Each structure stands twice: as C-alpha cells, then as structure tokens.
C-alpha cells in the first residue's frame, strides 16, 4: 500500500484538503457517468463543511454575522508592513471606506445587540480583535501624529469619534439580571471576560495613551464658550465621560456561592487567560489616569458644573466617576499618615516579601485570618491530654451521651459546645443577602503609591469646590423630579454613598489633624468644603429617600440611606465630643450650631422619627452588613440624645395636630365676646395656644429613646452579637452599651431574661482573650446581670418566661421586673346617644295597603336593611303562631334586641313600617314595641312583606325611587328629633342672600359672615345652625329638601338690584326655627321704636360724660322700657343739654327712618345691630368716657386694650 493510501485512511485528516491521486487510465474499464457525478458531489460537500462548521452553541446566523463583522474589520484597515520597513513598528493604515465601516459596525451593534437584546456582535468584535488591533491603535497613532500636518483633518477626527463611540458601546458595563434574554445570559460570562481584556489592553497599551487621545477629542469643546457649543459638542463630552466611567466600572466579578450547596464554594474562572488582578485593579487605573491627565479632566468638569457645563447633562456621569474612584477605599487610610507597619509573616512565622501588589495585600489578609483562627483553636486544644485520643461518656438515668474530641476536655463549656455541634438544628437562621447590591462589601487593596495619589486628588477636589458644585448640581436634579422613584436606584445610591464617604473623610481628617499646622494648599479643618451635603436640599432628599426605600421594601437602597444617615449623625456627635476638649475656640460655636442644625433638620418631622424607630426592628432578617449599620445608627442616636439632654437643647417636630371639637368652650359666650372675636386682629397669638403647641411639638428625648428598646430591636442586637467571631471590639462595645442602658440605666430587667442572650453572653466571654480590655467590660456586665437574674429567677413566673418571647404589656413587664401588680382603671365605654327619627307619611293618602307595603319594603331594602326585613318576617310569624294557639294571650310584643334595636329607634322608614303593621313604636330604649291589631291584620301584613321582599328590587313609575313617595310630617319639626345636624360639625349650612338694603345692612352681613367663619374655626356655638348631614337611609320631606351646598361659601353678590326683584329666601330659614318666629314683624317694629327712643335721649341730653350720668341714664332708660313717656323722663333727667355728641357710635335719625323693615330678617341680625347701642347702655361699666366704655366692654377687668383693637367710631360725617 502506498504512502498516500496510509494517510488517507487516517480519520483525523478527513477534513483536510489534499491532492487527488494521479489520473489512472480507465479506458479499459469505463465507469458509469452517474458515479462520477456522485464523487464530485462528495468533494463539494466536504468543502462546504469546512466553511460552515459551527462552534458549540453557535447558530448559522451567528456564524454568518461573525463573517460579516470580520469583513468590516478587515476593510477598516491594518498595519502597513511594506511602507514602514525602516521603522521597528508598523504604521496603521486606514482603509478607503474606514468611516463607513465604523458606521456599519455601530449599526450592527445598535440593531442586533441593543434592540435584539443579544451579545452576538460584541462577541464577533472580540473574536476579530477590533479593540486591541484597530481602535486603540488608531487613536494612539492619531494622538502621536498631532504635530504633523494632515490634509484630511476633519475626516480623521470623524473617524476617531466613531472609534470612540464604538469603544464606549463595547465597554458598556453589563450586569446579570432577571430581565436579560436567554442569549444574554448564555453569553454573559464571555462578554464580561472580553471587557476585562479591553480594559487591560487600554491601560497597558503605550502607557494608557488611549485616554490622552480621547481627551484630545474633548479639548476643542472645552475651549469653546458655553453659548457657542452645539449639541454635538455636548455629545462628545458625554462620550469621553462614559468611556472613563466604563474603565472604572469594569472589574473582575467576585466568587459566587451556590444557594443549594451550603458547604461548597462554587469557584468560577473570573479572569481571562494571561491576566492577573493587578492588571485591572484600582491601583493600575488611578496611576494610568494620573499619567494621562484624566483626573485633571474630572476636576475641571466637576468644578465647572452649572457655570461652564450643563449640570443636567454631565452631573450624573461625573458623580458616578467620583463614586467609582472612592468606592471600597477606607477614608481613614487616606488621612492617617502614620500607618502601622504591615505584618509580613505568615502563620508559621516565615518572612514575606514587601507588599507591592493587590494580590499580595489580599494574601496578607488571608494569612491574618488564618493566624487568628489557629490561635483560637490552640486555646481549646492546648491541654496535657492533647496528644491522646479522647472519649467522654455522660451517663444519665435513662440515656447516655458520648462526646469525642480533644476540645471536650478543656472546660465544661467546650463539652456542652461539642454536644451542641452533634445536634441537628431544624430551625436554622439564615441571613437574606438582599441589601448589599450597591454597597461594596469587599474592600479595595490600595498601595501606598495609590494612597498618596488619591489623597492628592481628594484634596484638590475639596479645595477647588468641586464637591459642592457636583453635589449641588445632582441635588438640583433630584429635587426637581416630581418623585424620587422616577430616578434610577443606582444614581441615587451613588449620590448618597459619595456624600457619606466624603463626610467620613472630613470627620476623620478633623479628628486626626486638628492640632496640626496645615499648608496653604490643603483643605481646611471644617465642614465648609462639604457644605452642599449639609444643605437643606440634601436633608429633604435623605428623609424622602429613607421613607421611600422603607415603604417600597427596597432594602438595597435603604442600606445606602442608613449609611448616609449614620455619617450625618456621626458628624453631629463628633462635634459634641470635641467641644469639651476645647471650649475657647470660636470655631466650636459654629460647629455646635451646625451639629444642632443637623439634628433639627433630620428630626423635624414626627413621621420620620417614627420611621427611624421601625427600621431596626426587621434588620436581623437581612445581611450582616445591613444589620451592622442599623446597630451603629441606634448606638449613635442614643448617644446623641444623651448629649442633647445634657446640653439642654430643645427640639421641636412638625406633627399634624388633632382638631379637638370642643363646643363647650363657646356655650356661654355672650354677644359682646363674639363681637370681640370678630373685631380681633388675626395677627394676635394666644399665649396659651402657643404653650400648648410647644408642649405637643417638643421633642421628647426620653420618650423617643424608649422606642429603641422594643423586643424586636433587642433581638436584632442579640443576633448581631451572636456573630462575635466576625465583629470588631468596637462593635461588641456598641452592643454592650445598648444592653447596659436597657438593663441598668432603664432597669428593664425582663427585657434581657432570654435564653438566647444568656447563651451569647456566656459564649462571648469564653471567646475573648483574657487580657483584652473588652473582656473586662463583658465580665463586669455579666456580673451585674447574673446578680439581678439570680434574685428574680426565684420568683414565679420568670423561669417560664425565659422560654417564650416577652409580652409587651406594661403591667406584665412591671410584674416580671419588680413583682408588683399594677391595676389599671377600667374605662367605661361611653353610651352612644340615641338620635330619634322623624315621623313619616305618604305623599298621597289614596295608596292601597298593597302599595304602601311595596313602598316601605322597597325603601328599607334599598337602605341595605334586607336582614331586618327577614328578621321581621320571622318575628311576625312567631307572633301569629302564638296568637293562633292562645287567643286570650296578653299583649303581644315585638322582641327587639341586638343590632336591630337602633334601627327601630333611629330609622324613620322602619318605624313607619312597624306603625303600618300595627305596632306602637318605642320612644326610648326602655319602651316596649307592643302590637295593637288582631291576628288577621298581622297575617295580612306578613303576606304583604313576604310578597314584596321576594321580588326586590322593584321598579316604580318613571324610574322613581321609593323614597319619592315618602315625606316628613308637617308636625314632625317640633320636639327633639334627629334632623340631620351635628353640633360638632365644622361648617355652617346657612348662607346670606343679597337684599335691597343700604350699606349698613351690607356691613351687618359682613359681620355675620365673619362671625360664621370664626365660629366654624372654633368648632361652633350651640344653637347655631350647622351644615346639613343626611345619613344614609333617612328620608326627608320633599318640600323641605334643598340643594346640597358646597364646602366653600359662594362669593357674596354686591351688585345693585332693582326694586321689582324678588329677594331670594335665606337658606338658614329652612333649618333654623325659634319659638317666636311668628312674631318677627312685631319684634322688629318694637326694636326700631326702642332704638329711636334711645337715640332721641342721647341726642337731647348731650351724651354721657361721667359715671354718675351713666347710672342716671340707665335708670331713665328703665322707666322708658317700663312704658313711661319719653318727654316726662327727659324732663326729670338731670343731664346737661348741648354736651359733646361725638363720643358714642351713633347713626343719624335719617338713616334709621330710611331703613326698610324686612320681616324675614333672622333674629341674629337684629342682635348684631342692637348690641352697639342697647347692650352698651344696659351693661356698660363705669368708665371716664363713653368711647372707652364701648371699647372696654370686650375686655376683662385686668386686660389692657391693644392699640390694634381700637376701632374708629362712626360720627355724623360718616352718614354720607
């Protein structure tokens, strides 16, 4: 066999194209032409297979798309190896249609990846090496050749902008979410790895010259004036910012944990081949940014927002860049120059090289953790029996336990702990990691070089006012939104986390560098450089953000909000702690005002204070980081309350005051006091009201502090302390302070009598090192706790209460803690006042019995009282059955009990139905409902009720309602019945209609309207008509029915009316009826006659100038009222004629004569007109002048008349 035959038999070479065998003469053996065609088709199929072979999970469409993208990338350009033989590196040559190729690639990305929700084009570009071999090479070469003349400069810039746009699209961050399509989920890991390759190449290629080329594209736009910029210029700046943001955002994903396998860590190869974490770490990024002036560009953009750059366009992206730079960096590390020398020994004491990379620093942390765990383990097994096997048997009466392991011999606690490990817990507590999406829980390991670089950048960022400019711009955008829910959650988280980080940085810097001398170019040691974060707008935003996140259960956002809220509290708390150290500085007074302002703004709303007390109650259900933030917030709040109580600082919260409807304060108010209310100025403030409001709105520190010691919050602290192995000593101390305040300061002993707390406290004491300071605090608290616990444990039922959650009743807590029984006074429930209904009648008297029952049953049915009708049928059936069995039975009664008793007393339709049946309806709850008809009438009524109830709903003529055929009896207005008014209603029903009266009458209407408004705001006066309230089911008389009036009074019509116009009836006349309505005409005539006599006396006598004359005048007036003639009284009155007549508010006689007498005028108008004359004369006190007498009528004996209450009196000159 030939060599060719041997290779052809190899199956691995089947896909290779090989030369055919030499032609053989087949003349002697002719073959069928069909066989030749089959051989040719087999050859063609083999070639097609070579070109259309698919990769795993690849479709023919993807294969074709990759081929198309490959053609475009090839046509874009490439290295010119021929034209650059003399150079060491080849020059990149653009293709003839390079710009068109870039635009086509952009269209493919937009149409397939973005619109189609796929990653096919992005993966095709990655396979073709578009970013590494073309885009970055083009940009860097263009930046290097900027000094050379270029004839097609404009075209080249367009190509570079297109290259930048594709770079932004290919490096746009991707995040795994449930909204991703199946294609995106399948290719997510591949796309993320390709982005890491892009980031490494961009940072390393020519020392990151790509950034310098990108910034060069933005320089023409920056140099332009704001008014000269076009939308295209803003788009270029946006592309540059997005490219910087993408490079900061792309990071290797952390290790993922499977939720199904609790003990197995699912490790994924997160990095591409030939890549380390140091290649894309924050250290490499910041050093590259520093070399290529990216940080300077960010300072320029952030510092000029609002002035040179549109803040709504660029502020969010600038904020995100700053947030990504400082995320995961400990703020105190940038301030503390004296850093401790890192430990460079492993767990075995071997020396390690100097830390110079991120991986080395991560390894150092792992070795520290290993060393700590070995130390803890060695404490438990370091016994003299450590080298021998251990088997401990515990024998009981009915059972035995065997414990194995060396830890069981060290102490009794370890023995019990070993027993607990062998048990299987069915009720396991697991944290829900649903609150850490925006919080970077894994810290960034930054080197000393990066620390100095970042410290310099942050200093310039604060000194240049960039922080205030950036935060003011973003805050302006957020505050301008109608609702924070319309803003992206990630943008809100970036804003508040950045604010919190700079607060922590400033607080640490002031704390560490307070006594040091600073350079001129360093940031000052105050909070002026972060003033935008302490502005009024930011406090409104943080309060709204906390409320929205808690109400919508956005735990990730709430975690962010609590971090920012904690930093604000820490700033206020740090000021009070430092105040006692240096009280002579003027800066301390400003800091004190600022600290008070923070608390005042945060706790200005009562709803927010209540919200803060609810958040820690559910904190133990979420991640440990979120629980840690909530515990620290509670600790700082309690400390702040203590500081404010010591400083005697008073806070006031805004709360909705309850309007107390108390009409009894106005029952005994006479008309003069009502007039004083009308004439009093609105600007006057009642001191008692101010004191009451101050007491209601004063922030009670003790009351608010008590809300933080509920059982759920105590449980959250116990759960947090149970993870003591992962806590720092500072966090353990915070929990101890909380328990100390609860148990010792507040003496709430039963709050900590819990088995879980006893177990945690015992385990914590054994875990802490013996020589540590925190262990001394734990032992001291344990001593006081057990001392009290032993005494109370002997008292029943404390041993039982240990097994169950504590009941929050105050009397039970007092009994468990002190053994005292507190008897609460039993509050008697107020009996509801019965409101009796009016009597009804039919609109026509010729209704038949059948029609009457049809109307009544339908009316009750439409009042949703169908159950009453069913009950009535049962009762009537029972009564008829009893009457038929015992015809000589005594009076038959309707047994009205339970829920139907109020209907019989208060529902007019029900009472009318019972009357038609033949019952005597009760007038009170003690009366009985007796029957006055015979058995035959009851049987007939029962049949009517059954008949019409079974066919409900019933239609009437012309679609009328059943209530249309019922009305209130004419004599039903007398007596104390329920007419639909409520004395406690805030509004008055009657309105005044314009009449053909003079100006004096219009002023009286003004007084009346003002009186109504005052009474309405003061919860009303008894006897004044109120707004009509028609309860459901009440049927009123049709002729007494009026249109419902609106809540607001209609504007009074002051137009001129003709004499022939009819006056509109007063609405109050429909409801207000007094006992002397029929004698209104006689009373009005007598009133005007008496008024005329009084005016005549005052005019002829010359007025009243001293108290003696006033007494004589009052005696004379009494004689006139008694019926004596006016002339006789004037002759005997010893008053001087011709005295001053301008001291009393009198009107001319012509006005009185010309006043028309309106018979329908309500009595309240007459009282308002007469009180300025008659009542002043009859009840006026002894004063020096008449003017003072009329003014002091409205004041108490020891009250002074304010200047604003003195009203101008009406003299003769006002008559016109």
Swiss-Prot record:
Biased composition annotated in UniProt, kind: Basic and acidic residues: 1064-1074
Subcellular location: Nucleus
InterPro entries the record matches: Timeless, Timeless_N
Bias kind Acidic residues: ranges: 11-23
GO molecular function: DNA binding
UniProt biased composition (Low complexity): 1139-1151, 1165-1194
One GO-annotated biological process of the protein: DNA repair
GO CC annotation terms, alphabetical: replication fork protection complex
Biased composition (Basic residues): 1024-1033, 1040-1052
Key words of the record: Cell cycle, DNA damage, DNA repair, DNA replication inhibitor, Meiosis, Nucleus
Region annotation Disordered: where it falls in the sequence: 1-45, 1018-1082, 1139-1216
Coiled coil: none
Ranges annotated as biased composition (Polar residues): 26-35, 1152-1164
Assembly: Component of the fork protection complex (FPC) consisting of TOF1 and CSM3.
Function, in words: Forms a fork protection complex (FPC) with CSM3 and which is required for chromosome segregation during meiosis and DNA damage repair. FPC coordinates leading and lagging strand synthesis and moves with the replication fork. FPC stabilizes replication forks in a configuration that is recognized by replication checkpoint sensors.
Similarity field: Belongs to the timeless family.
Record protein name field: Topoisomerase 1-associated factor 1
Originating organism: Meyerozyma guilliermondii (strain ATCC 6260 / CBS 566 / DSM 6381 / JCM 1539 / NBRC 10279 / NRRL Y-324) (Yeast)
Gene: TOF1
